[in-house]
């Protein structure tokens, strides 16, 4: 059973990338469940997010990170020094992974960004393939995708690798 984690900001629902990502994922038939970590959303926006993600053909859960239930959980975990210290994508992913563990039904979990403008559902298949193929002995896979816009390379790979090579 394959589960996907999508950490996103509410603002990404109106961007160029996430609507395409949801449309592409809706065309897959192998996901068992999707966990969506929703950041920077008030109650009205969280309801809109639910409607937005209903386009998915796969059952999903939205973790509303700014909602009362997660805030209460975060406070309890803070007291025990078990909660992430800072808000952001890391915290979002941390709680989504916790939800996946609590659900206890996934055999493999994939995670990817929600701002990939060049997204194609084959990216998701390529991300899962090494860990779900029984002929391979992989337990972890990290995928990279090009971030090219306006005839220039963007993103982490460009910033951390290419630019550092140029400055040598």
Protein language model regions, located:
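Short beta-strand-to-loop acidic/aromatic patch adjacent to the donor-nucleotide binding site
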Residues: 105-117
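N-proximal low-complexity "stem/linker" segments adjacent to membrane-targeting elements
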Residues: 1-26
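Short beta-strand-to-loop element that shapes/binds the nucleotide-sugar donor at the catalytic cleft/hinge
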Residues: 137-156
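Short beta-strand/loop segment that forms part of the nucleotide-sugar
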Residues: 31-42, 63-65
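Short acidic, S/G/P-rich loop/turn micro-motifs used as interaction or catalytic elements
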Residues: 9-14, 41-43, 116-119, 147-150
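Conserved donor-nucleotide/metal-binding helix-loop-beta segment in metal-dependent transferases, i.e.
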Residues: 119-142
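Conserved small/polar residues in nucleotide/adenosyl-binding loops
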Residues: 166-168
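Active-site-proximal specificity loops/subdomain of glycosyltransferases
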Residues: 45-104
């Amino acid at each position: 059973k394959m589960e996907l984690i999508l950490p996103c900001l509410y603002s990404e629902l109106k961007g160029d990338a996430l609507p395409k990502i949801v449309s592409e994922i809706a065309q897959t038939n192998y996901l068992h469940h999707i966990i969506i970590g929703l950041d920077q959303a008030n109650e009205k926006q969280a309801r809109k997010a639910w409607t937005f993600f209903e386009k998915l053909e796969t059952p999903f859960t939205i973790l509303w990170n700014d909602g009362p239930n997660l805030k209460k959980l975060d406070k309890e975990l803070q007291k025990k020094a078990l909660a992430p210290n800072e808000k952001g994508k890391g915290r979002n992913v941390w709680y989504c992974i916790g939800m996946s563990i609590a659900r206890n039904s996934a055999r493999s979990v994939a995670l990817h960004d929600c701002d990939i403008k060049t997204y194609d559902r084959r990216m998701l298949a390529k991300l899962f393939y090494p860990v779900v193929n029984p002929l391979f002995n992989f337990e972890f896979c990290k995928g990279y995708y090009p971030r090219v816009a306006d005839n220039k390379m963007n993103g982490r790979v460009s910033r951390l690798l290419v630019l550092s090579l140029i400055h040598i």
